Amino acid sequence: MAIFFLPTVLSGFAPHSEEVFKSPARFSWSNLTPSELKNRFVGLSTKTNALGKAYFTLEGHKFMIVGGSIHYFRVPREYWKDRLLKLQACGFNTVTTYIPWNLHEQERGKFDFSEILDLEAYVLLAKTIGLWVILRPGPYICAEVDLGGLPSWLLRNPVTDLRTTNKGFIEAVDKYFDHLIPKILPLQYRHGGPVIAVQVENEYGSFQKDRNYMNYLKKALLKRGIVELLLTSDDKDGIQIGSVNGALTTINMNSFTKDSFIKLHKMQSDKPIMIMEYWTGWYDSWGSKHIEKSAEEIRHTVYKFISYGLSFNMYMFHGGTNFGFINGGRYENHHISVVTSYDYDAVLSEAGDYTEKYFKLRKLFASGSARPLPPLPPLIPKAIYPSVNLSFYLPLFDILPYLNQPVMLHTPVTMENLPINNGSGQPFGLVLYETSICSGGSLFASVHDSAQVFLNDQSIGILDENHEVLQIPKIQGCQLLRILVENQGRINYSWRIQSEQKGLKEVVSIDGLLLTNFTIYSLDMKMSFFKRLRSASWRLAPKTYNGPAFYWGILNAGSSPTDTFLHLPNWHYGFVFINGRNLGRYWDIGPQRTLYLPGPWLHPEDNEVIVFEKIEKGFDIQTRKKPQLQECYETGSGLPDAAGDADPC
C-alpha cells in the first residue's frame, strides 16, 4: 500500500493522477471501526518508520483520520442519526464536535446535558453507527457562537481575565471540567468508547496572553482521566504560540498551502500532519453577502490531502443552525452579527440535504475504500404548508405582566450583572430599562448592541455602540423613558471578548444629569414565558403596526409534519417561535431570507407561531421547500416558483 508523505511531495514526487486511488485497501479509514476493534490497549498514536516518515496508528494499525465536523447543539436531536449516517455514507470515519460551555452551564453551577445538549447520547450514537469521535471541549471554542462558547456570567467580574490562569477564570473552568470530564471518561477509546482524541482549548495562538494557560488546561484534562491523544488547533501564524508540550499540534486552513505544512513539519518533524480544520465554506454575517466555495476546489484539495497521506477534518461537514440566541459576532468599526443559518456552504446543507460537494467527495472516497461505502440515507422530505395569518398581537409593553418580576436598581447595570438566575445574570435576549424623566434634552447612553428608545409607548429614536446620544424633545410633566436593548451576539474571538457585556453600560444621563431609579425587565424569551403568554388577552392585529410587538398565529402542518423553510415577506427584524422554540433571528438586510423549521419540532395539525417583530408588521408567513440564503435568484425574478421553491443564484 503506497503512502505519500509531505517531504516527498515538497521535493516534487507527488502523485499526478488518480491512479493511486485504485489500489486495494488504499485507505485504512474503511477497515478500522469501533465495532471491529474489540481489544483496546494503545489508542490513536503517532509513529515514524525507518525512513523517518510519521503516521498515525490505531491499535497498531496505520490509520488516516477522515473527519467531518457536526455540532450536536446545532442539529435537532431527532436528526443526529440522519446526519451521522450521511457522514459515514460519504466515506468519513470520524466526527468532530465542539462542546459549548455557555449552553451547558448558562447559570453558574447549573448544568444542562439534556435533549439537544445530550453530549453522551450523541457520542454513543456515533459509536453505534461506526464512527470515531474527536472532542473539542474548550473551554473556549469560538465556533461563531456567543462569546466563543464562554458563559456570559464570567463577565460579571471585571477583573476576571478570560482565557488566562486568572484565579477567577481557572476556578470556573475547573468546576466545569469537574462536571464535564467524568461524562467523557467512559466514552474514551481505551474504555471501549469512540473518542480517539481530545483538543486542548482552541486557536490560542491568535489570542496568547498567558504562557502558562495551555499547560494548565492540558494538566487539567490529564488529571481528570483523559488518556487519549491530546492535540491543539491553530492557523499557520498561531501554531507555534498555541502549541503545548505533550499535545499534537494540528493546523487550520482555507486551502492547500505548502508553506503552512513546511512550518508545521519543522515544528514536529517526528509527528504526522493533521489538518484539524479545512474550511468547506464560511459563515455568513448580517448585511454581508452569502459566502460560497466551489465543489471542485473542495474535491481537489481533499484529493491532495489524501495523496500526501495527510489526516484531515472538514469544518463543516454539516453546519446546522444557530437556533435561539446562540450566534456570535465580530467587530469591524461596528458590531456585526452572525446569521441564524450555519449552513456554512458545507458538504451537507443546513437541512441535511446532499450537495455537489457531497457527491464529489463520496466518489473520491469510494475510489480508495477497501469496501463499498454504505448506501445513501434517504432525503428528508420538505413541505409547503398553508400561509400563516398572524391575526392577533400584543404590543411590547402589554406583555410586561407576563415577564418575571422586574429588578429595581438605583442605576442600570448590564444584562450579565442583573441580580437574576441565581446570581448569573441574563445570558441572551433583550433587556428593557425604564425610568421617569421630567425634562427633555441630550440623552447619553452607552448601549450594546442596539437600542430602541421610547417616551411612554412612543418611539423617539435608536442608539448603538457608535451612536450614544439622542435628543429628547421637550415634554410636559414627567414621562416614562424606556430603552429596549438587544444582545445581538457577543463577539466570539479576539481580545474584545473581555469587554462584551451587553445592555446599558456606565451612566445614563440627560444634559449631564444622572438618571436613577430604574425598573429593569429581562426578556430572555424562555419557554416558560411563552406558556404564560398563552393566558394573555391577545388583540386582533391591525393591517399595519409600527413598533415592537408579538404576533400570534397557527401553522397547520397536517397529519405528518416534516421540514420546511419560513419566509417572512415585509417583516423587518425579529425572532420566530414555534411551539415556544426559538428558530432564531430574521433581518431584512439579508443575506438570509428564510428560517429553517425542522419537522420534529412541529405537532400534527395545529402549531403555535409567535413572531416578535421590533419595527413594523409584515404580511402572512409563507413556507418553502428550499432555503434562500442570499439575495438573488437564477430566474432574476426575486420570487419563488409555483412550487414554493426559490433557487438562489
From Swiss-Prot:
Transmembrane segments: none
Entry keywords, A to Z: Glycosidase, Hydrolase
The protein's Enzyme Commission number: 3.2.1.-
S-S pairs: none
GO molecular function terms listed in the Swiss-Prot or TrEMBL record: beta-galactosidase activity
SUPFAM superfamilies in the record: (Trans)glycosidases, Galactose-binding domain-like
Disulfide bond found in the keyword field: no
Keyword tRNA-binding: no
Biological process terms in GO annotation: carbohydrate metabolic process
Enzyme class, broadest EC rank: hydrolase
Active site, UniProt feature: E203, E277
Family per similarity comment: Belongs to the glycosyl hydrolase 35 family.
PANTHER family to which the protein is assigned, alphabetical: BETA-GALACTOSIDASE RELATED
UniProt-recorded name of the protein: Beta-galactosidase-1-like protein 3
